[in-house]
Amino acid sequence: MPNWGGGAKCGACDKTVYHAEEIQCNGRSFHKTCFHCMACRKALDSTTVAAHESEIYCKVCYGRKYGPKGIGFGQGAGCLSTDTGEHLGLQFQQSPKPARAATTSNPSKFSAKFGESEKCPRCGKSVYAAEKVMGGGKPWHKTCFPCAICGKSLESTNVTDKDGELYCKVCYAKNFGPTGIGFGGLTHQVEKKE
């Protein structure tokens, strides 16, 4: 049957896509409402989409499903995730959780409830709500929140912590990340033996 006045077929729902509602990706057309990650169903756009053959994914799910696997292949230095990848068909074995200590009081909750503020780890002074920035699970002053090595201003998206200090991702990777061939951290020349 001819397709009179219609558009291409949607790569997700296989219904006709008209020009006003069309998003093109990898040579295929999609409705704006059908342009979602095939694994986590997150809405996509041109900056967040990653295509694999006829499938579309967000960059995170694409990396988990088709990216390199193993130690040293993560989302960057200091990034941890609790996602097991089950929605991608990946298997995960979790080690048993250690027993929790039986404590009944939390001094930081007590302090916050009765007006005493928490202390900044860098300067030791009180941190009030108007100047509070969270990093490494602790409150910091905005002025006490630069990278400990390069002094670059940090945000929640580029901060990593180690031993109570804050670092930008670049300094963290250079100083605490994996080293050797393939990691960009080769510190000495390898001699060729004949």
From Swiss-Prot:
A motif (Nuclear localization signal) lies at residues 64-69. The modification Phosphoserine is found at residues 95, 111, 153. Residues 1-5 are annotated as: Interaction with TCAP. InterPro entries: Znf_LIM. High in striated muscle and adult heart. SUPFAM superfamilies: Glucocorticoid receptor-like (DNA-binding domain). Residues 10-61, 120-171 form the LIM zinc-binding domain. The keyword Ubl conjugation does not apply. LIM zinc-binding domain 1 is required for self-association. LIM zinc-binding domain 1 and LIM zinc-binding domain 2 both are required for optimal actin-bundling activity. LIM zinc-binding domain 1 mediates binding to MYOD1. LIM zinc-binding domain 2 mediates binding to SPTB. This is Cysteine and glycine-rich protein 3. It comes from Rattus norvegicus. The gene is Csrp3.
